UniProtKB/Swiss-Prot annotation:
Domain spans labelled VIT: 87-215
Pfam families tied to this protein: VIT (PF08487), VWA_3 (PF13768)
Stored PANTHER family: VON WILLEBRAND FACTOR A DOMAIN-CONTAINING PROTEIN 5A (PTHR45737), VON WILLEBRAND FACTOR A DOMAIN-CONTAINING PROTEIN DDB_G0267758-RELATED (PTHR45737:SF1)
Low complexity: bias regions: 13-51, 751-760, 774-818
SUPFAM superfamilies membership: t-snare proteins (SSF47661), vWA-like (SSF53300)
Ranges where the t-SNARE coiled-coil homology domain occurs: 679-741
GO cellular component assignments: membrane
Region (Disordered): 12-51, 751-822
PROSITE patterns: T_SNARE, VIT, VWFA
Example of a GO biological process term: vesicle-mediated transport
Protein name, entry field: von Willebrand factor A domain-containing protein DDB_G0285975
Amino acid sequence: MLQSLKNVFFSDTTTTTTPTTPTTPTTPTTTPTTTTTPTTTPTTTTTSTTPISNLSIKRDIGNINDYKNANYFNYYRILENKYNYLRYNTGLKNISNNETFKLIDFTIDSEMNNTCITSNWNQKYSNNSSTPVEGVYKIPLAPYSVVSGFTVEYQDKVFIGKIKSKEKAQNQYSDSIASGGQAFLAEKTQDGQFSFRIGNLPPNENVTIHLTIISEVCPHLSSLQNCFHRFLFPNYSFNFQFNLNIKLTLPIKTIELLYYPNKDIKFKENSNNKEATLTFSSNNGIDDDIVCIVEPENDIERPQSIIEHSKLNNTYAVSVNFTPSFSHLTSDDVNQKSEFIFLIDCSGSMSGEPIKKAKRALEIIIRSLNENCKFNIYCFGSRFTKAFDNSKMYNDETLKEISGYVEKIDADLGGTELLPPIRDILSTESDFEYPRQLFILTDGEVSERDSLINYVATESNNTRIFTYGIGNSVDTELVIGLSKACKGYYEMIKDNSNFEEQVMKLVSIAFEPTLSNIKVDWGTELQIEQGPTKIRPLYSGETLIVYALLKDNKIPQSTVQVSLIGDGPTGSKLEFPITLDFSKTIDYENNSVHTLAAFNIIKDLEEVERKGNHSNNRDRIEELGKNYGLISKYTSYIVTAASEQVTEETMKTLNIIQIPTTTTTSHTNFETEEDSDDLFSSENRNQTLANISNDMEKIKDIFDDISRLISEQSCMLNEIGDANIEASTLGINSIPQKSNIFSKITSFFSSPSEVSTSKSNFDSDIGSEERRNNNNNNNNNNININNNNNNNNNNNNNNNNNNNNNNNNNNNNNNNNNSDNSDSLLKLIRLQKANGSWSSPFSEFKIDLSKKPSNIDNDDIWITLIVINKILNDYPTQQSQYDLVIQKASKWVKQQLTRLNIPNQYGSLLATSKLYI
């Protein structure tokens, strides 16, 4: 039976006021912003709330203006970290300093609804070339965005792009150029950029480019956002105009435009504050990101829907979005299923205190889980081991078994090969009834980091990743990148004294209420094609967006009831009704809902092929691509036209700097099994200048780093000398770490084949077994050398660990009391059963069972109450470590009291039992 929604979801406690003038919210000083709020009669809703737990770790989820921490911004974060010069080479621009193409005017007209943002770009470039030109145009395109149309204008002619199969487009382009005609070929490149070539442009002819870009709206917390990153614009002055038309199905609370105060926001009359416009202009170009933040009123019980009618072919598409609120459920209400997998770095560098801390944290974590969970533990180094072949249900038997596995964990697995265990985990079909949450704990760096991050991103629909970076030498981008790619969280652990607290912080987030195993029941009246087919679990603060194309143009004359169904955080099935009223369809000019529905369906079809299911979806992918103007694995944009005057002079290729690519598909960040066609071979013909520019930048970076290092303490030289030489995947790093200087020098002076990303290497688990063994031997040699040096310098010590212990003797003495206290806490936690109780016989300390109240028929209830008090009383400073353990124990006690028909006596019994600790 479906649980009543009103018993599960409650309105947020809010107070809405009516400002007579725009208000300015409190924001970081680095993000100037103003807010416009509609002037309507306010409503005030106050609902009593019960927090998840008065003991739980409260995380700072930020505010809606903190867009750089939003999931959607991860694509741009990666660009900022790796392609520091990308902004200088966006659009039509020569590689040299003489700007043959210069942007003069740029206008963006956008329309936002609940799920889609359609943006029409108009860019006018001046062309000062004195010879015929083959130009190359590139812009970074986020994975949730698609180009659905483009045209090029020059010499009073308009050339419209059309989608064709990739092979036909390439052949047609080559034939047209060879015959002296004009041609344009557009692709999405492997590094995630939209790129097209403009062949045989006559000298001194200005060019106007029109693009239609359709993006999924960017949800962040309670807001809908539209972001144009500064890398989309050149770094010089030009005329810019931005117009945004907002049409939502819910009233708008506030509208903000970050960084640019000189904008105009107006709410449309008689729209119930559901429609508004925002305009902004500049004569000096764009210096910062353009971020529009719209906060609508949230309906936590009803998903919102849009029905779009396409006049072009008389078809219909539907989009559904939903942001439920779980904030007022108590910890006692939550009874959700989940799969927890812990992946622990057991390489040699984790020896000593780090591995001890990791094991202790693991022991606390596994006793924080509940009997609705599956769990498993992996240890990795040069090889990997795991507690179970596959995740097992959590109970006393499996808890005992995995505790024995944890006890034997040590830093004895050599190097750091993270890909093989991750592949083993992600290659296992996920169970959407048990949302998979993966915790990775590491202190090092891995080979081909970016390929690894791109790989896990393909599994973000079924796995959420949490990462911990330990120490000062960990690869920060690895830690952040893995978590962001799968919409999780990360924690950098620099100080071992807070190790367990920081670990439990992320575990607590993983326990927050979730809607999982989500499906849309479209009923029997509608024949639909849904995208995405499998819906990701909906975690706290996230928004669900799903699309569908109606297969049959025949639609019902009346409304249709469909449902969003999922497993709720209380353990019950939840159903959210959706009313589709086909008398209230919307005719968007650019068919944005149709386009994103097709885009998501294509991604699903390409993903099936990527996973090697031997499905041939080419015909359907080509059909969708051609119908909705979408670039895909099998389709490209092409425009050709016969030139009135055949270009006889030598054509010059104007090319932006070649950015080293990561392995990606057309829609995802992972290369398919088939190699992409090399549609840009003409760019290689004049690459010499690009290489020189790149090389000079690299040389400058290297010597800047060396100069900086020389000025630091001499001990840094030892760190550099011991550093492993690592070939950079991208060839260009962000801010280099001190220990990677030799790596950069080696990468620079190596042959391209030695430093470039190799798909074949990655497909064979990042190198052959022989190479991994060699790496392992090198790691072992390094460890032995370090130990020998330590022994020579410290003759009184028997081994490297003793040396470390002696060097830190004073610190250990200062922390002895805390360590003993922690060990005694861990002893108590180890005695807890899988259901949360402590049971008889209990030998850790004396418990007088004769004091047990007469209305309690189970000794375990009394023992558990006393142990709860014991932990709370004796270990107040370690509350964040045992919080979930206590929650589980108290929940078990309350369940037993409910069975005894005394559910309201928990507080009094807890107070009574405190007298006997």
